[in-house]
UniProtKB/Swiss-Prot annotation:
Homohexamer. The oligomerization is ATP-dependent. The keyword Nucleus does not apply. Part of a stress-induced multi-chaperone system, it is involved in the recovery of the cell from heat-induced damage, in cooperation with DnaK, DnaJ and GrpE. Acts before DnaK, in the processing of protein aggregates. Protein binding stimulates the ATPase activity; ATP hydrolysis unfolds the denatured protein aggregates, which probably helps expose new hydrophobic binding sites on the surface of ClpB-bound aggregates, contributing to the solubilization and refolding of denatured protein aggregates by DnaK. One of its GO terms (molecular function) is ATP binding. Residues 561-770 are annotated as: NBD2. It is found in: Cytoplasm. Residues 4-148 form the Clp R domain. It comes from Geobacter sulfurreducens (strain ATCC 51573 / DSM 12127 / PCA). SUPFAM superfamilies: Double Clp-N motif, P-loop containing nucleoside triphosphate hydrolases. Residues 771-865 are annotated as: C-terminal. Residues 7-72 are annotated as: Repeat 1. The gene is clpB. This is Chaperone protein ClpB.
Amino acid sequence: MIRPEKMTIKTQEALAGAQQLAARQGNGSIEPEHLLVSLLEQEGGLIAPIIQKVGGAPAALRSAADVLVKRLPQVSGATAQAYLSPALNRILDAAQREADTMKDEFVSTEHLLLGFFADRQCAAARALLDAGVSRDNVLAALMEIRGGERVTDQNPEDTYQALAKYARDLTDLARQGKLDPVIGRDDEIRRVLQVLSRRTKNNPVLIGEPGVGKTAIVEGLAQRIVSGDVPETLKDKRLVALDMGALIAGAKYRGEFEERLKAVIREVAKSEGKVILFIDELHTLVGAGAAEGAMDASNMLKPALARGELHCIGATTLNEYRKYIEKDAALERRFQQVYTGEPSVEDTIAILRGLKEKYENYHGIRIKDSAIIAAATLSDRYITDRFLPDKAIDLIDEAASRLRIEIDSMPTEIDEVERRIIQLEIEKQALLRESQDPHSLERLKKLADELEELKAKSAELKGHWQREKDIIGRVSSLRQRLEEKREEAKKAEREGNLARTAEIRYGEIPAIEKEIADRSAELEDIRKEGKMLPEEVDGELVAEIVSRWTGIPVSRMMEGEADKLVHMEDRLITRVVGQDEALVLVANAIRRARSGLSDPNRPIGSFLFLGPTGVGKTETAKALAEFLFNDDQAIVRIDMSEYQEKHTVARLIGAPPGYVGYEEGGQLTEAVRRRPYSIVLFDEIEKAHPEVFNVLLQVLDDGRLTDGQGRTVDFRNTVIIMTSNLGSQWIQQYGSSDYARMKAMVTETLKEGFKPEFLNRIDEIVIYHALPLEQIKKIVDIQVECLKQRLADRRIVLELSDKAREYLSREGYDPAYGARPLKRTIQRKIQDPLALALLEGKFQEGDTVRVDLSVSGEELVITKK
């Protein structure tokens, strides 16, 4: 009998499983048949793969073994534990002898399988032989799987066929045509080939920003190896990608991870240069598997890399390379850096054109060239925190996905007709209950006619939609077949089967292409009656996706929006009174940006609003936010009175490394990162510390700002508004009497308050005039309108007489303080007495409240009309 400590974990599990099966079936002894069933149903076991390798069918063998178990005698009412039968003891002894013969330290499941053949009279052994499993072919399969390895620990299965378990064969995937085509990147691939062909330190590491195509370069290399487009030294090599997740997952005990990694290194070394190992996210090696006193993965790889036994390609980002690899000089020197830069917009367009067919076939739609150009150019300009070509590919993918969902959904025209039918059916049922009424009968007849008409229309539309959908689906499946045939032709050509290659290329492919053309022509004929389903991704759809991602309106303007922008000043004047010059300057900047004529490397507009308090500087920013975003609170508002100290600059852009709050980011930079298209208002800018202006210089000039964490924040889609009271004394003193002198005095005051390099970067310095009495009357109307809206929620109507309006204008007018005293006057004279009257119950819902001037002309009277 084998001692338990001399069994592998899988052997112990198999025997325990056999014991449980015997107990469940009510058998008095544990037989070889129980053990065979237990071995076949083991997860991650070696027996099922061995049987498959020798040509047997594990599922059929399992069924046969189940039948044998059911035939075993059952004992009812027995409580004693089942014992090992003599037949099973003989198999276990034979397994021990097999382990000794193979010089293995532990009895493994494969030894148990060989043990079955020692007792040919055993029913389980006969079942194995009937399934085509013999001792000789099991030994041959075992040699192939184990590769001459001995069982030296209790978990040997983890180390068998390590590459098959813990790596993906990229060359095999390339042969099957499962990798996306790699366009361009010839310089980087050539550089990788040069490093791989070196005698020593032939391990390139691809370094670049996330999304620039590092993994794609390795996939391109795999495709080149398959097509033979590589130097002689690299021909017929296997490129396998190590799966770190699979390597670490399930390694419960100390040393298991190291065993697995050693097995991978051994298998690569044994291939004598035939296998090139690709480790994506190379930095994950540093610290992987390190526990108390254990080595991490990178230290285990170093000796093999240094000796040249391990051919390896790494890939990692710049930040992670600096953070993990550069700190370990011994690991860094074993790799040769290959820098991978971000491709240009032109290169990205070429890459997208190469990938176009793959995405068309997957989504079953067509992608226009205008969509590809839009994806590359718009993602480059508006999605600044990611890199080409990844962000452009994502745009195309999402646009295609959205179109596919539209094709699969019911068109709006049919949906509207169906809803109308349901509505009329409900109405019909209601009228049927009142069938005695002659008017109801007449209405019923009309309803029946309308329903019949609508149902006929619905059936016609559905038929048209279904025909379109069927043809689009058929064309999609034909395109997929075409791609499969092209891959088959490439495979046949590689294998030297030229007859099959010619048959596919000159027979099958042209036939499929002809059918695609016929179906497309049929679709065009159907669409002459009317197009119901979109089928092409165009530039406009891509622009819409960009708008959804960023909140920046880059899609083509609808007629309504264009008209809105043309009359932008008229809309703003309804909120900001008496400052026409300021509104025209702001409107021009927005129009330039939306028509695509503004400088792409600067903010949409940067303005310095000057003027006395209460004349509408901050209100202009709010009115602009309401115009652009339909929400006057959609402003990144920074009150500069909070930034009077030098150290408060850190609050704007984020604390530097080592300081508290480093992870949180800055108030300005974080707000703009989240909403790249916004209005940034720096209120009362003259109150800020001079250091703050130095931070704003690069925002105003280059439309960018680097935050405390080194990230570049894009300000090119923001409107920057700064307000200040500097020079307001001159504006009030000279006002409209001497505009030229007033402007000269204000400019002098500005030069004293701000540095010339700051003033020189501002697009427009806008001077707000003090408000005359006539303008205050207009503001009364605006303020009272707000009050009317609040009362309308309570269904109370407010009316204001002309005399009351004149009175409020006079009382609320103060040239020194602008419109703010007016707000306080309305609060004091109307809101306070009205609030008291409402609480006393003098006014109810549905009442009309009239505000008039008293006979004395000294106060307002509020009465019910």
